[in-house]
Amino acid sequence: RPWLLRLIREVSGVEGIERIRLGSLEPRIITGEFAAELARLPKLCPHFHLSLQSGCDATLKRMNRHYNTEEYRERCGILREAFDNPAITTDVIVGFPGETEEEFAATRQYLEQVHFYEMHVFKYSKRAGTRAAVMPDQVPDQVKGRRSDGLLELEASMSREYREHFIGSSVWVLFEDMAEVEGRKYIIGHTPQYVKAALDILPAFYLSH
């Protein structure tokens, strides 16, 4: 943790770098002190990806994860206390061996309670040589698909709700690309929270660039 903070501070001091966005973080790295130090860096984007994998403690134990759902929830709370409406994203695996309907329901309820901006939902697939590949109670592909579809619907709803918080507000956008939709040209970029934004390009602007 100390070396990561030192690195972020050093990068923050580099002239010309205006945004620092962190990659995936281990949940246990998030402490009150760590989050408070990050919040003091104006270039640090309030977008944090904390991999969860499952919202059920029994499933997490079979996955050999070194945290539980309550610890994870506390980490999200720390970030939300340190930053104003941070974007928290995560990874979730459905259909891990032994995942029952009750465990999946617990995961879905947990995700709804913690509330994420985005979730990357993956269906568990066997990998030769891993402990999970030979575990009993492998989940059928059809069940994995149904569970994945359900969480993707939830993800779309939560993401839309998070983005709606910014309607009517002024935000900084880093424009990085151009796109054309139905004959109209737009410049595309992201806010510090990694919310995608599009700005209609006036014809005169487009021709001059």
Question: Which residues does each PLM region occupy?
Answer:
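Flexible glycine/acidic-rich beta-alpha junction loops that bind and position SAM and/or redox cofactors
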Residues: I29-E33, L52-M63, V94-E101, E118-Q142, ...
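Hydrophobic, well-ordered secondary-structure elements that form the walls
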Residues: L50, D91, L111, M119, ...
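Conserved SAM/AdoMet-binding glycine-rich loop
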Residues: R1-E101, E112
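Radical SAM enzyme [4Fe-4S]-AdoMet core and its adjacent flexible, acidic
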Residues: R1-S12, G16, R62-M63, K126-S157
